[in-house]
Amino acid sequence: MMKFTVVAAALLLLGAVRAEEEDKKEDVGTVVGIDLGTTYSCVGVFKNGRVEIIANDQGNRITPSYVAFTPEGERLIGDAAKNQLTSNPENTVFDAKRLIGRTWNDPSVQQDIKFLPFKVVEKKTKPYIQVDIGGGQTKTFAPEEISAMVLTKMKETAEAYLGKKVTHAVVTVPAYFNDAQRQATKDAGTIAGLNVMRIINEPTAAAIAYGLDKREGEKNILVFDLGGGTFDVSLLTIDNGVFEVVATNGDTHLGGEDFDQRVMEHFIKLYKKKTGKDVRKDNRAVQKLRREVEKAKRALSSQHQARIEIESFFEGEDFSETLTRAKFEELNMDLFRSTMKPVQKVLEDSDLKKSDIDEIVLVGGSTRIPKIQQLVKEFFNGKEPSRGINPDEAVAYGAAVQAGVLSGDQDTGDLVLLDVCPLTLGIETVGGVMTKLIPRNTVVPTKKSQIFSTASDNQPTVTIKVYEGERPLTKDNHLLGTFDLTGIPPAPRGVPQIEVTFEIDVNGILRVTAEDKGTGNKNKITITNDQNRLTPEEIERMVNDAEKFAEEDKKLKERIDTRNELESYAYSLKNQIGDKEKLGGKLSSEDKETMEKAVEEKIEWLESHQDADIEDFKAKKKELEEIVQPIISKLYGSGGPPPTGEEDTSEKDEL
């Protein structure tokens, strides 16, 4: 029976792929694949029959998922933002993925807030990020907006490489993300001006990257994906280009950052013991420690000890300690071991033995930790994980292949993706019981209906409460949404027939309908976590904000450029006047004095007017040119070379 369902699902999906081909008549341009990570993001594109992972403007193929606001009002994204974390910790935002789609009361949010250097506040029962955006202005951002800024950076990285606009993308999420987190990620794409054609699960994307060129026979593949902030395990079968997820499990709140945190806590305690001082009071010191601990952790993947040296760490004192691999492992051993539980669960759910697994694929930067590799190897009785895949880039690689399929690229072959819903979905029935409609690990897209009835006589309304989770009582599961079906004609309890239908689309997003079979009366809800999700108005406002920010960034850059032009013009003149070999030796003392005075005046003005407008900078430069040009012309005869070796903007203006 199960085999039949899968085949049916495959046909269903092939149908969906065909339907997609119909949709494809609209030109989507080049679709990019984006791995939106907790700590780093990565973008790829399918071009000329192969995937290109695109380097950013710093030449790096992965970009930190960081956004910062400087005191001057400049917004930095990526490497530039991460590089100034220690000098501006309160206004450097990271880890938005740990907050996205969660409520304020979520225990993991409350735990995270303790360690984040920026301010997280409650707004509409959700965590919002509050920062100073320069000029004494404070602004709150939804986690979706911060993620949107990172997505914008990835979009621009792709555009710079492709030389054209990018409007459509495939974005990946942890397989264990729930409905709210998926929907919020889609919203982030919208705010960034991207049409997110498909949300795909990270381990599935990694499996595509691994298995794309492996066409022989059916294989069982276990993907173990441990990144900066999330952990997923998925078991897939790959058979001639058909990728079917059989089971998935994980923890959306476990990753490299948690390992860093353990080491930081260890050193903070140690420092207090040695000096009696509590470093936690100093945000900058904590962020310096964070940066150095992360470096040491990376070093320990290839060596047995690393030194952590921080100059003027706290109250002017230096910090110098050694971290050994053994100590690092001891501090994190419980977390490392906890990664084996989901592996066990996935095997149980798919009715497979350890020996049935053909390949183990390690994904995510944290799988470079030797202890993690050892635990995985021991769990599978000494089987070596497969090595042929870059753990940082695999997810973006797979997303780019899926993007190639969606943009109708012929070279992707007949790739078919069968994914599953990670959590059981159901409704609450009398006594707070969770009645399951779609069990977890059901292949999506899927549709399931069941008939329910009323609990009391003449009941005019039924309230449908939709939950996700594995526990038998709804109070222990996660409420997705609630809606009412009204206008049920009076009848004894148990007589009315109410058909409840659950339908999940390819993005794993759920729609629930309820219909009174007697009257044909219908109501439906697309589970978009109304209480937890941005409204269309909010999304529109955020899209406008994002455009405004981009505009402001552009203006700010122009202002800085014109300021720099004036500054380099003035200093270049100053140097030449002071150089006896150049201008200085050719000017009359009167002209020299006039020029020196004019140049000094502009340099002084610049020092006290850093925040002037573009127009002011231009005007001051023009004033200076009006004094300098006649003197130079007199000296060289008109049409002579300009005074500075590099600047000839005045000539350009004349054209």
Swiss-Prot record:
The UniProt record describes its induction as: Induced in sinus, lung and brain tissue in response to 3-hydroxybutyric acid (BHB)-induced acidosis. Induced in sinus, lung and brain tissue following intraperitoneal injection of streptozotocin to produce a mouse model of diabetic ketoacidosis (DKA).
For this UniProt entry, which residues form the secretion signal? 1-19
Omega-N-methylarginine PTM positions read R493
Q: Name one GO cellular component term.
A: endoplasmic reticulum-Golgi intermediate compartment
Q: How is it modified after translation?
A: In unstressed cells, AMPylation at Thr-519 by FICD inactivates the chaperome activity: AMPylated form is locked in a relatively inert state and only weakly stimulated by J domain-containing proteins. In response to endoplasmic reticulum stress, de-AMPylation by the same protein, FICD, restores the chaperone activity.
Q: Where does the record place the modification N6-methyllysine?
A: K586, K592
Give the sites modified to N6,N6-dimethyllysine. K586
Into which EC class is this enzyme placed?
A: hydrolase
Task: Give its E.C. classification number.
Answer: 3.6.4.10
Positions carrying Phosphothreonine:
T519, T644, T649
List-wise, which residues carry 3'-nitrotyrosine?
Y161
Q: What is its main location?
A: endoplasmic reticulum
Q: Which residues carry this modification: N6,N6,N6-trimethyllysine?
A: K586
Query: One MF term in GO for this entry?
Result: protein serine/threonine kinase inhibitor activity
Give a yes or no for keyword Repeat in this entry.
Answer: no
Q: What does this protein do?
A: Endoplasmic reticulum chaperone that plays a key role in protein folding and quality control in the endoplasmic reticulum lumen. Involved in the correct folding of proteins and degradation of misfolded proteins via its interaction with DNAJC10/ERdj5, probably to facilitate the release of DNAJC10/ERdj5 from its substrate. Acts as a key repressor of the EIF2AK3/PERK and ERN1/IRE1-mediated unfolded protein response (UPR).
Query: Record's domain comment?
Result: The interdomain linker regulates the chaperone activity by mediating the formation of homooligomers. Homooligomers are formed by engagement of the interdomain linker of one HSPA5/BiP molecule as a typical substrate of an adjacent HSPA5/BiP molecule. HSPA5/BiP oligomerization inactivates participating HSPA5/BiP protomers. HSPA5/BiP oligomers probably act as reservoirs to store HSPA5/BiP molecules when they are not needed by the cell. When the levels of unfolded proteins rise, cells can rapidly break up these oligomers to make active monomers.
How does the annotation summarize its subunit structure? Monomer and homooligomer; homooligomerization via the interdomain linker inactivates the chaperone activity and acts as a storage of HSPA5/BiP molecules. Interacts with DNAJC1 (via J domain). Component of an EIF2 complex at least composed of CELF1/CUGBP1, CALR, CALR3, EIF2S1, EIF2S2, HSP90B1 and HSPA5. Part of a large chaperone multiprotein complex comprising DNAJB11, HSP90B1, HSPA5, HYOU, PDIA2, PDIA4, PDIA6, PPIB, SDF2L1, UGGT1 and very small amounts of ERP29, but not, or at very low levels, CALR nor CANX. Interacts with TMEM132A and TRIM21.
Annotated protein name in UniProt: Endoplasmic reticulum chaperone BiP
Per the UniProt entry, what species is this protein from, by scientific name? Answer: Mus musculus (Mouse)
Encoding gene (name): Hspa5
